[in-house]
From Swiss-Prot:
This is 4-hydroxy-tetrahydrodipicolinate reductase. The gene is dapB. It comes from the Bacteria. GO terms for biological process: diaminopimelate biosynthetic process; lysine biosynthetic process via diaminopimelate. Disulfide bonds: none annotated. It comes from Corynebacterium diphtheriae (strain ATCC 700971 / NCTC 13129 / Biotype gravis).
Amino acid sequence: MAIKVGVLGAQGRVGQAIVAGVTAAYDLELVAEVDRGDSLDVLVQSGAEVIVDFTTPDSVMDNLEFCISHGIHCVVGTTGFTPERLEIVKKWAEEKGNTGVLIAPNFAISAVLTMAFARQAARFFDSAEVVECHHPNKLDAPSGTAIHTAEGIAQARREAGMPTQPDATEQSLDGARGADVGGVKVHAVRMTGMVAHEEVIFGGPGQSLTIRQDSYDRTSFVPGVLVGVRNVAQHLGLTVGLEHYLDI
């Protein structure tokens, strides 16, 4: 039996790609398209079992509270999740008990693999920095993907007992060295013509390693979202990161 899916943010660029992907999938049924100003009640009325949320940081928490309270599983690509917000969502899901929530900083499988490869490489190099590039309409900087990547690198370095990265900088213009995420510098570029791109640069004596990921179109997120939709009901509570569904 097909999984009944509702898409929130259905008129956005990513939302339109998700709608097309769900519609084309033989084992999924699109039952609701929700956008700004629409009532969430349509999700209940249409019998949606899973929702996909690509809305805005301002609306996503209200959306999740509604869906979790009604036992609708959630696959979320919206950005802006702080540790405090994640803790709130985790509490909602635990209290409900029968609902799965997947929040992922990036649903492009190439991006998920980039984050995994970066964690693996981190302990072998003295230095590591992250550069992310996005279209100029993106609301947050640095991206959730870049933050998640840097956090993974920082954790791997701590687990390996590595010292602070070498950096003799004493004077610089404000922001010149990027944002600091657990001791890993993250740089954000906003530029016309870009979609979503990330470079992770590692450096050691006499060598460097660059891991690069490019999403040229919003359709790059669709395969990962569909993995989430098909599996979220088997992962009750809150899961952060698509990698947990991909066994990597």
